[in-house]
Amino acid sequence: MDHLDLTQLTTCVSDLAAQSSSLAAKCHQIDTNGASRTMDKVSPSLAREILQLKESMAATAGKLQRMVQEPPDFLQRLAHQAQLLACIQWLAEFQILAFIPLDRSVPIEDIAELASVPKEHLSRIVRLTATAGFLQEPPSEMGHVAHTPLSTQFVTELSYLDAAMFLADLAAPTALQMTKTTKRFGQSPSPSHSAYNMARGTAAPFANMWDDHSIKLRRQWPAYLKHVVNSQAKSSSSDLLESLGCMDRLQGAIQCIVEVGAESAERAILLARRYPSAQFAVQLSGPAIPGGVWTAGPPDQAQKEVLIAGRIDVSRRAVGSPQPISEAALYILDLSISSLNLGQPKEHVSAELRAHLDILRLNRNSALVLISFILPDTRTGSLEEETMTSLRELCMLQLHNQQLLSFKELSELIHNTNDRMGHLSVVREAFSGTRDAIALEIHYQAHSV
C-alpha cells in the first residue's frame, strides 16, 4: 500500500461505478419473467452487451483488487481458491449438486442422507463455496442449502462440471509437479517427460489419453478446453474467418465446406443458418467414443433440427488420413478449438497439410483455411488476455511438454509442404487483435520456372 497510485485508484473506482450503472440499465431492459436469470429470452445483441459489461466489470474489479492487496491478502486468496476447488470436487464426486432442487432450499441433513455423506462435512463445504457465490445457506433458513444462479448452471450444463473435475483431478495436480519435472528432466523436449507424466506416474504421453478406457476423462478434457483454456476461441475464430474474407464465396452459392478435425458440429450449424445454400461436412477428431459423435460436444435441440435438415454430414477422420472429399470450396482446419493438437502441433499441422496437398493442386479454386493460436510476437493485450495466453502456454508445457508454434514456424511448415510441381502458399492472413491467434488462407502454387 506504500506505493498506491491514488490517480489510478480513483480512475479504477470511477470505471467500476460507470460499468455497474451501465449493467443495471441494460438489465432493466429485460422482462421480469425469469429471462434475467437464464438469459434465454434476451435478444442476442443485448445478451452480448451484458456479457461484455460483465467481463469489463470483472477485469476492473480484478485490477482494483491487485492495486490494494497485501501479501496476506494474496496468500489468503490462494488458500481460498485451493479450498474452493477441493470443495467443488467433493460436491461433484458425491453428486450433491444434482440432489439439491433448482427452485427451492432443502435441509442440509436431507441432502447428506441422500448422498451418504456426513452432515457436518457438507455443512462446512457449503459455507466455503457460498463465499464464492456457489450454493448458499439462506439467512432465513439456517441449516438449509439452495442453488445460486452460478451453481445452477453446473447442473443444467454438465460440461461446466466436467471442466471443473478435469481441473481438480488432473490439471491442478499436474501443475504442482512442475518443480519435480524440471529437476528430473531438465529441458528434455520429449512428450513423455512432462509434469503430466510425473503426476500420473506413467511413461505414456498425454496424447495417448485417447487410448485410455476412461470415458470420463475423454469427456472432461474437451470441456476443460472449451470453458477454460480456449474460452474465447469460438468467437475469435469465427471473427478471424470473417476478417479473412474467405466466406464471401458462399453467398448464394451451392458449395461444400469441410471442417477438419472438429470437436463438434456447433460451428457448422451456425454457418448453415447463415449460408442456406451451402453443404457442410464435419470431420470429428479422435477415435469413436461410446455414446455417439456428440459425446465430445453438444448439439441437441433435436440434434439441432437434425443437422439443419440434412445439409450437415458428420463423420470421423483420423489426423493426416486421406481426405475423402475432393471438391469442397473450403477446408477449415481450426486448431484454436481442437484438443491443442494432442501435444504434437508440428506433426499434426504437417500431417493435415500433406493430406490436403493433392486436393489443392487438382482443384485450384479450393482453399485450406488454417486457424491456430500462436506465440504472440508482442505482449500488448489486456491483463485478462495475457492470462489466457499464459494459461494456454502452461497447459501445453505441463500436459504435453510442448509449446505453441510461432507465426514464422507455421509459415515455414506451410511453404515446405510441396511436391515436384509446386507447394502450398499463404495468400491471405488475419491476426486477432492480441496477435495470439491467426487465420491463414492457403492455396497450391506451382513452382516458378
Curated annotation (Swiss-Prot):
Induction: The expression of the dibenzodioxocinones biosynthesis cluster is positively regulated by the transcription factor dibT. Keywords: DNA-binding, Nucleus, Transcription, Transcription regulation. Residues 78-148 form the HTH iclR-type domain. Residues 108-127 bind DNA. GO terms for molecular function: DNA binding. It comes from the Eukaryota. It is found in: Nucleus. Transcriptional coactivator; part of the gene cluster that mediates the biosynthesis of dibenzodioxocinones such as pestalotiollide B, a novel class of inhibitors against cholesterol ester transfer protein (CEPT). PANTHER family: MONODICTYPHENONE CLUSTER TRANSCRIPTIONAL COACTIVATOR MDPA, PUTATIVE (AFU_ORTHOLOGUE AFUA_4G14580)-RELATED. This is Transcriptional coactivator GME11369. It comes from Pestalotiopsis microspora.
